[in-house]
Amino acid sequence: MKITHITTYRLPPRWMFLKIETDEGVVGWGEPVIEGRARTVEAAVHEFADYLIGKDPARINDLWQVMYRAGFYRGGPIMMSAIAGIDQALWDIKGKVLNAPVWQLMGGLVRDKIKAYSWVGGDRPADVIDGIEKLRGIGFDTFKLNGCEEMGVIDNSRAVDAAVNTVAQIREAFGSEIEFGLDFHGRVSAPMAKVLIKELEPYRPLFIEEPVLAEQEEYYPRLAAQTHIPIAAGERMFSRFEFKRVLDAGGLAILQPDLSHAGGITECYKIAGMAEAYDVALAPHCPLGPIALAACLHIDFVSRNAVFQEQSMGIHYNKGAELLDFVKNKEDFSMDGGFFKPLTKPGLGVDIDEARVIELSKSAPDWRNPLWRHADGSVAEW
């Protein structure tokens, strides 16, 4: 079997799919994207095509190494996201050829189900109580929300109180009947992160995500030393080599590699194993589409340290398409009591509605994340 063609489709709301075709008619799908940089990743995918056309898709490890090492300059969000989507599609092909789901090819299940959590609120958290109430009605009991709006390097008590009050209202409304994580999105400086973590401790959030930017990773162990709240990060780390540094340094309780950013299934399975060796939990990042989610689920079901799975149903970014709008076998992604079950169809287990993909790709938006500014006019972290 040989790879014959690679096609990319930019899609609403902010996704990109790719299709790898073979000379035997077997097709694999992947989801390579950096949110807000889809065109750039698309260009990288087609550059990698030169290494892939005419090659055997079954040699996933070798093709991964070629894409990663054949270029003197490597790594980073664009290259690793392109590799990620290609890698997903190669695993999809292998599973279809062998008539087995990807988790079966990776040694089989370590669990029967995995808890999912749902987003509530928006970029600036609002209507959180109502959002939680609605989602509880369809089985969710675990949630994530943005922990604050933009925050200055040294900000005032009002900004701190606004963040804390949202969390206090959640606990007052629901007590211990639900759990929630707080995503600070790297919006907070290290000095303000120390203040916020101290103030939030009594409300026992499930985790605090990206309290500082990934490039300030030296603060993770310092912040962890002052709190009992688990600290999570990883969506802006792109290979096992970046995760190696934070695991060695300590501080993170939960790793959140993104299966569409960090080299795909091949790389993230290695990252999951590294995390387990350090007694660190795994919770793959996935505010993206169905192929990315499927890839995450296969990793979850073969990784003992996986604890819960993000998914984008109803997330505030989903304008123009919802999580399963491009999927024919929607029933396979249904949740029972807030849990996903293993996908059982061969490959990734996603039956893509290709006609709908082609149609909506003709008018795909060029999504960009908001540009925020502080009151003084300086650029704020989004």
Curated annotation (Swiss-Prot):
Encoding gene per record: dgoD
Protein name stated in the entry: D-galactonate dehydratase
InterPro entries: DgoD-like, Enolase-like_C_sf, Enolase-like_N, Enolase_C-like, Galactonate_deHydtase, Mandel_Rmase/mucon_lact_enz_CS, Mandelate_racemase_C, Mandelate_racemase_N_dom
CDD domains (UniProt xref): D-galactonate_dehydratase
UniProt signal peptide: none
Pathway: Carbohydrate acid metabolism; D-galactonate degradation; D-glyceraldehyde 3-phosphate and pyruvate from D-galactonate: step 1/3
Site, as annotated: Transition state stabilizer: E310
Free-text comment on the cofactor: Binds 1 Mg(2+) ion per subunit.
Keywords: Lyase, Magnesium, Metal-binding
SMART domains: MR_MLE
Catalysed reactions, semicolon-separated: D-galactonate = 2-dehydro-3-deoxy-D-galactonate + H2O
Cofactor: Mg(2+)
Catalytic site positions: H185, H285
One MF term in the entry's GO annotations: magnesium ion binding
Matching SUPFAM superfamilies: Enolase C-terminal domain-like, Enolase N-terminal domain-like
